[in-house]
Amino acid sequence: MAIGLAGKKAIVKEVNDVASNALAVTVAEYRGIEVADMTALRKKAREQGIFVKVVRNTLAKRAFEGTQFDDMGDALKGPLVYGFSMDAPGASARLFKDFSKENKNLQVTALSIGNGIMGPEKLDAVASLPTRDEALAKLLATFKEPVSKFVKTVNEVPSKFVRTLAAIKDAK
């Protein structure tokens, strides 16, 4: 099915708009995946707020121009599906990693967080990045720990004094 020039321009604009607002992109080869499996991947992506699209590589290269993913051009070879993380940098990598466990035909070929392209060996590292809420929770726990230790230390001095007085009273 041939796409006309207007359709190609619309695809490039749509992908460019998404790429401009995305935190990260994960690119995977989907050769050999059945339609039902690809539909399941898209459904999971929608539930997680990840934009997934199959685009011709030449159109994707043009769509990435002027975005933070401009350097992805050399990695775009073969039938590829693109996953754009809009909320958490590791979301699309996590989705593709989990899906590739069930379906071995999905092979991550490249990923990018901002400027810089990474190979598939970095998939585990990117997929393990915390979400915004998880990162904030860890940060708050880090801030809270020294304060709680200080309060316990300050509280320990009077209670130790009271225990000493009680021991002296019991001794007499």
Swiss-Prot record:
Biological process annotations from GO: translation
Organism: Idiomarina loihiensis (strain ATCC BAA-735 / DSM 15497 / L2-TR)
Keywords, alphabetical: Ribonucleoprotein, Ribosomal protein, RNA-binding, rRNA-binding
Function: Forms part of the ribosomal stalk, playing a central role in the interaction of the ribosome with GTP-bound translation factors.
Recorded superkingdom: Bacteria
Cross-referenced InterPro entries: Ribosomal_uL10, Ribosomal_uL10-like_sf, Ribosomal_uL10_bac, Ribosomal_uL10_bac_type
PANTHER family: 39S RIBOSOMAL PROTEIN L10, MITOCHONDRIAL
UniProt protein name: Large ribosomal subunit protein uL10
Gene Ontology CC entries for this record: ribonucleoprotein complex; ribosome
CDD domains cross-referenced by the UniProt entry: Ribosomal_L10
One term of GO molecular function: large ribosomal subunit rRNA binding
Entry similarity comment: Belongs to the universal ribosomal protein uL10 family.
Subunit-level organization: Part of the ribosomal stalk of the 50S ribosomal subunit. The N-terminus interacts with L11 and the large rRNA to form the base of the stalk. The C-terminus forms an elongated spine to which L12 dimers bind in a sequential fashion forming a multimeric L10(L12)X complex.
Cited NCBIfam families: PRK00099.1-1
